[in-house]
Amino acid sequence: MNSIFSIDDFSDPFWETPPIPLNPDSSKPVTADEVSQSQPEWTFEMFLEEISSSAVSSEPLGNNNNAIVGVSSAQSLPSVSGQNDFEDDSRFRDRDSGNLDCAAPMTTKTVIVDSDDYRRVLKNKLETECATVVSLRVGSVKPEDSTSSPETQLQPVQSSPLTQGELGVTSSLPAEVKKTGVSMKQVTSGSSREYSDDEDLDEENETTGSLKPEDVKKSRRMLSNRESARRSRRRKQEQTSDLETQVNDLKGEHSSLLKQLSNMNHKYDEAAVGNRILKADIETLRAKVKMAEETVKRVTGMNPMLLGRSSGHNNNNRMPITGNNRMDSSSIIPAYQPHSNLNHMSNQNIGIPTILPPRLGNNFAAPPSQTSSPLQRIRNGQNHHVTPSANPYGWNTEPQNDSAWPKKCVD
């Protein structure tokens, strides 16, 4: 248990209220014999009077402030539990009798008339004694070893009149606040990872100036660890920035590829629409061709496909006939024309001279006007009946002159 006592722990039921004097208006002081008190209280009072008289005789009154400062500084230190034995109070009082009850007012053989004042004086004395005992016990215990950092070394707390309580006992709140501030500084300095070079130099100078060689090595190791951690953080930041740059580049390429894909999809859609339009045009042209064939069939009375085949057959049958010096009239067969009346003509009237003039020689063919004038007339008559609006394709199947027809093949 802690040996520090609080004012709230002491209440009125610990001692009885002294009886009211018979003549309160009289100014005659009342002695201790006239007040009925219990034996322990009077014994404690006599003990305090003896201690106060011995303290006054041994020390001057000017040392009261030093005693109060010593009590406040000792009270601000952490208390040690497990030493709550009140049997050693007399031993501590005998050893340090000079420091007891220096802040308490001087008491006399007479007791104050008012019972409340008397109770307050007793409370003050008791609290002073308790504070003295606590200070002696804390002083007898060896303080904890301080850390290597100079910030953790506790400075002696200087008490001021404002920190002293109403009863002359100093409060330990400033010391606790200071200790809390030191611990918070240590925690923040240990948890914080961002240090500047100037702070590192200051810390190194402070640590190397007031520490042992082992502590100096430890501090240097800590500084090197911080520097390595700083370098690693810098490398990580550079890597992160590089990765972010690559990500931005990839995002740009991705956006460009998406644009190209959208353009290709648009072109594909346009091509598909154009293909459908062309297919529709092809179907329309096929329908028009069928209508034209029906019109030709209705006008000519025959299938245009058969007409095209017959014209091709006539072209294949017009082959030249070879001979040495003469051509037979029966060797030339006119083309078959189904709607021509000239086919019934006799072939006797159609002929080509068999003997050429002697001056031209055998290798020269006769002119068309002399050799094939009747045949030319027949062909002209055939073309006259066949060519007019008989071909639906708009081109003539028969040649208009005989210049395209070979008359003789030279050996």
UniProtKB/Swiss-Prot annotation:
Q: Where is this region: Basic motif?
A: 217-236
**Keyword line:** Cytoplasm, DNA-binding, Hypersensitive response, Nucleus, Phosphoprotein, Plant defense, Seed storage protein, Storage protein, Transcription, Transcription regulation
Database matches in InterPro entries: Basic_leucine-zipper_C, bZIP, bZIP_sf
Q: Which cysteines are joined by disulfide bonds?
A: none
Species of provenance: Arabidopsis thaliana
Instruction: State the gene name recorded for this protein.
Output: BZIP10
Q: What is this protein called?
A: Basic leucine zipper 10
Gene Ontology biological process terms from the UniProt entry: plant-type hypersensitive response; positive regulation of DNA-templated transcription; positive regulation of seed maturation; response to molecule of oomycetes origin
Taxonomic lineage is: Eukaryota, Viridiplantae, Streptophyta, Embryophyta, Tracheophyta
Question: Which GO cellular component terms, listed alphabetically, does the Swiss-Prot or TrEMBL entry include?
Answer: cytoplasm; nucleus
Motif Nuclear localization signal — list its residue ranges. 219-226
Q: Does the keyword DNA-binding apply?
A: yes
